[in-house]
Amino acid sequence: NPLEPAHIHIRNAESEAKFWLEPEIFLARNDGFNSKELREIFSIIESNQTQFKETWYDYFG
């Protein structure tokens, strides 16, 4: 949704989460991921935050 701040959705067969990318990475919603999975996801987002934000702004303007 371009009306919201930059964010990323993470999904698998049974779970879904949404993370805000700015002003800092923040878990907005979690439905099904356990705490270990969320830490792993957070780490991946943190390592790729710049690329995710650039892609988001390229897509939504």
Model-derived regions: residue spans:
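C-terminal structural segments of small proteins and small subunits
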Residues: 32-61
